Regions:
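Membrane-proximal helix-turn-helix segments that form the acceptor-binding/catalytic region
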Residues: 6-14, 21, 35-56
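A short, histidine- and acid-enriched strand-loop-helix "catalytic/donor-clamping" loop
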Residues: 17-36, 112
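Acidic anion/phosphate-binding donor-loop and adjacent secondary structure
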Residues: 31-32, 76, 80-100, 111-116
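A short, active-site helix/loop in glycosyltransferases that binds the activated sugar's phosphate group
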Residues: 45-76, 81-86, 214-215
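Conserved donor-binding/catalytic core segment of Leloir-type glycosyltransferases
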Residues: 55, 94-113, 118-122, 131
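Nucleotide-sugar-dependent
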Residues: 112, 159-168, 175-195, 206-214
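Nucleotide-activated donor-binding/catalytic signature segment of Leloir-type glycosyltransferases, i.e.
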Residues: 134, 141-171
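A charged, aromatic-enriched C-terminal amphipathic alpha-helix characteristic of glycosyltransferases
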Residues: 228-234, 241-280
Length: 285
């Protein structure tokens, strides 16, 4: 079982044994030289096609490599919630008050687009609230601490996952999951925040122009916005109504909660089928 492109490449150079490959990041897209990036993309696709099975953590990664021509030896296993979350009861929420919407970010606080979106909301909508749950990255500490000057900004600090998630999501109306589009990887990734939003029936806001935005709109569970564009953010917030928010909440409710959990049933079934086929091949030989 090979994790990441660098490990898989070293393995392929040294032996010809069968392998299962997992890709959770498009690591070669971080290379600034486009020609080198293309070489590694060619190698990556060869490794994928040569595998017994390739496990992707996002359907977007398959789309990046192969457009709509998905190879048969691939499977998508997203970063869903740990089944341990079932040990903690979901806390019922009050109906959303559109005069005082509680926006929330849950996770490592570091992205510039998150700062810009939060600043725009805090500055232009003093009636709404913005809550941060998670530690602030040291590189962005100054920026985000500056937001504390707004009376409608709340920095809650770190939290325990998954123990604290029910309380956190019961305290917010909309969860923010916007990321900087500087890296190609972000455009195609599928963060676990998507599955938290569905599980806790909370509308999600993501970055326009990403695979995540496509999925959120397809499922009808949230909104996409250009977080770096002040006019876009203001227009988005002004467009929020009780009806549109309830429509997204209902979209979350329609999805079976089991599909948000990291149970890996499909993966185990595929692995079992591979083992059966391998045994049949050996018996024929």
């Amino acid at each position: 079982y090979l994790f990441s492109l660098d490990v898989a490449l070293m393995f392929r150079l040294q032996c010809s044994k069968k392998y299962i490959y997992e890709e959770s990041d498009l690591v070669h897209t971080y290379i600034s030289n486009r020609w080198v990036q293309r070489v590694f993309e060619y190698i990556d696709k060869k490794i994928i096609k040569g595998s017994v099975l390739t496990v992707f953590t996002s359907q977007g990664f398959i789309k990046y490599h192969f457009k709509d021509d998905t190879p048969n030896n691939t499977i998508v296993v997203p970063n869903r919630l740990t089944p341990e979350i079932l040990d903690y009861s979901i806390i019922p929420k009050d109906a959303i008050n559109t005069s005082c919407i509680k926006f929330g970010f849950v996770g490592a606080v570091r992205f510039k687009s998150l700062y810009r979106l939060a600043e725009t909301i805090l500055n232009n909508f003093p009636n709404h609230e913005f809550h941060f749950y998670g530690t602030i990255n040291s590189n962005r500490d100054g920026d985000f601490m500056e937001l504390d000057k707004f009376q409608n900004c709340y920095l809650h600090g770190g939290f325990k996952n998954p123990q604290d998630l029910p309380h956190i999501y019961s305290s917010i109306d909309i969860v923010i999951s916007t990321y900087d589009l500087v890296e190609e990887n972000v455009k195609y990734a599928e963060p676990n925040k998507l599955y938290e939003a569905i599980y806790f029936e909370t509308p999600i806001v993501v970055t326009t122009g990403t695979y995540l935005a496509e999925k959120v709109n397809e499922l009808g569970i949230g909104y996409d916005v250009d977080a770096m564009n002040e006019k876009s953010v203001i227009s988005f917030v002004n467009s929020l109504t009780q009806e549109s928010l309830q429509k997204r909440i209902d979209g979350c409710k329609r999805i079976d909660k089991e599909k948000t959990l990291n149970l890996n049933k499909e993966l185990f079934e595929r692995l079992d089928n591979i083992n059966i086929k391998q045994k049949n091949i050996h018996s024929i030989r």
